[in-house]
């Protein structure tokens, strides 16, 4: 089986690793960590002949300009990659990549590759695209073997690309060109004259680069929004609604949550969206004209039972005697959590369907029908959708608004209205913040001076919706405040986002990057972000040479420095071997009578 060495080069973040992973695994990688250097292998059949294809991935950052060419000897074909939505990566082919290959590995065939074809035509990206015509013109200008436009995500043209690369590497024209290549010609030139063979035996072999290892995986903590909402319902804290039944215990709830979850209750309480039907009239509610409701009583109420400030009113709703308390409570639980609570198929599910249909809440009816039809595995997706919908509607109706507000936060001298029922149960810190400790402040909580308005608003939005505007805001500030409020899932979301920011900020270079990665490591250590800490430690260790030259490196404590030095990549023994190799090459150049001249 003939072995083919294929080396992939190009700017950082153009999709080189995704291209190789998608080709060798037939799947797009769900997570991507920038490559330092990596190798892949595939056995393929081309034109009825078997080939072992060695795929060499390289780092595009300028920090590795010295080490990258050590992957070039014995290469049979190069792929130079650019992203079709990054004109800078295309322009670097002529400015950087072609000259680098021409210098270190002349006469080796090159195939030009356009990546991320699936993004072509996405006008919302607002990035200048590179046309196929421009790419083909460059192929003709520089004498490349061809151009293929690909999408690793959609598997577009991947097989065509690597088939072309193998045919190019094994073509008679390519073999003839390689024989002219000198010391860095490919392994395919081993059939040249005996004098060439003896000369090539004296050429030093580059040291084998040890693997850098993969970056640690950052896990996102699973949302517990439904469990937190159930805890809020069961605690009955801050409730301003009481549903009463004939000779049965009442059910307590919260108007802000009921309105966020159900159009029926928005019409009952008079807080409708523009897409809703008109609100019910109070007279109709008290005269039995609204199905399932016998009467509604509204009483002024300044304080909750625990002495904290209330939403201003307490509403008592008498439920029609035809409605079973268990069925109605199941309905309320479903509004809060999106989870259908039942014992078995005989647990009054038909009655629950009837109630759901009478109030126009189709999702509860669907969940019950799924159980009766043996399709209960579909219900978690309904719950996830309802949790998201509740959060989004609560944001639209109530976020930072005075309507039904029962607490105010004072941040940087500005007052923010909030609703305790929508932020309760998220963490013990939050619960303590809005509880009895602040009775004397009349429902006002003043945050400390180190809390910024924008970061607090992001935290508050997360409390309402389980989503936070991390991309638009200060991700580090949100992480710090999220840790203070003990919102561990939010911290994990920030950790993942910041890790991606590190990748984006270092696509061109690491030493010259404007992002302070060492500062992020120190922040992660101080603010209980262990996943980000591990990621930063791995990144700094794996890019030790450029990172140690940054002035922030001196800020690291001795323990952290020792860990980084002990895990540095490339390791010291490899760098020493590189120095020895370079010395041997210099000796060979000086004694080879012009063999290294172009």
UniProtKB/Swiss-Prot annotation:
Q: Which GO terms describe its biological process?
A: actin filament organization; cortical cytoskeleton organization; establishment or maintenance of cell polarity; mitotic cytokinesis; regulation of actin cytoskeleton organization; regulation of cell shape; response to bacterium; signal transduction
Where do the segments described as Disordered lie? 175-210
Q: Where is this motif: Effector region?
A: 32-40
Question: Which molecular function terms from Gene Ontology are attached?
Answer: GTP binding; GTPase activity; protein kinase binding
Entry-linked CDD domains? BACK_RHOBTB, BTB1_POZ_RhoBTB, Rho
- Residue ranges with Low complexity bias: 182-197
GTP-binding: is it a keyword of this entry? yes
Q: Where is the BTB domain?
A: 239-344, 405-472
- Provide one Gene Ontology cellular component: cytoplasmic vesicle
Decide whether keyword Ribonucleoprotein is in the record.
no
Q: Which residues bind GTP?
A: 11-17, 57-61, 115-118
Q: What keywords would UniProt list here?
A: GTP-binding, Nucleotide-binding, Repeat
Q: Which domain of life is it from?
A: Eukaryota
* Stated family: In the N-terminal section; belongs to the small GTPase superfamily. Rho family.
**NCBIfam families from the xrefs?**
small_GTP
The name of this protein is Rho-related protein racA
Query: Native species of this protein?
Result: Dictyostelium discoideum
